[in-house]
Amino acid sequence: MKRSASDSPLLFDLPLAPDFSQEQQLMKRGLKHIAGIDEAGRGPLAGPVVAAAVVLDQNDLPEGLDDSKRLTAARREALYEIILTKAITVSVASLSARSIDASDIHKAALEAMRRAVIGLTLKPCHALVDGRDVPPGLPCPGSALVKGDQRSVSIAAASIVAKVTRDRMMIRAGAAHPPYGLEIHAGYATQKHRAAIESEGPVPGLHRYTFAPIKGRFDC
């Protein structure tokens, strides 16, 4: 990986698209199955945080994998189906808004990641985790990669699976709670969502009562 002049690990030059080089470095050490881990839903005012763990087949990597945020919804959906077909194993886990409020979003996201890895049908030799922290309690060693979804195809695959899974959950939540428009914004703090919270109030079990502007203003 090319470094900037400062050689800061946070200021590396990102590749145009994620690749398999991170995984290959680990495989050269004799580690066969490498899991990519990512989550979706840290910032919204409503809904769960969802994590995914994916172990790709190095001989059958899906084409076009990228950070889910850089893909259209249609492309994410298409790649989601391809990942489920081609990956060696995929696992998803989520923590509810109540669980997020009971701890905090950072801890909840790490716990969702841990559960996703545990849910894989085989124990990975190593986990590549998007972000700065490796979840405690993983069943294998792990490495944190800042902007990992733009560096590792395994993490990119996990980001797509987590995002599509959560978006589908929020579409169902939107059908159950029409005033909030959850199927449109997936629970993020859009003007429409904030206005609906003001007029209708937050929904217990759906909204995150520890997040502004809900925090301290409404009873659970």
Swiss-Prot record:
The gene is rnhB. This is Ribonuclease HII. It catalyses: Endonucleolytic cleavage to 5'-phosphomonoester. It comes from Brucella suis (strain ATCC 23445 / NCTC 10510). GO terms for molecular function: manganese ion binding; RNA binding; RNA-DNA hybrid ribonuclease activity. It is found in: Cytoplasm. Belongs to the RNase HII family. Disulfide bonds: none annotated. It is an enzyme of class 3 (hydrolase). Its EC number is 3.1.26.4. Residues 32-220 form the RNase H type-2 domain. Its main location: cytoplasm.
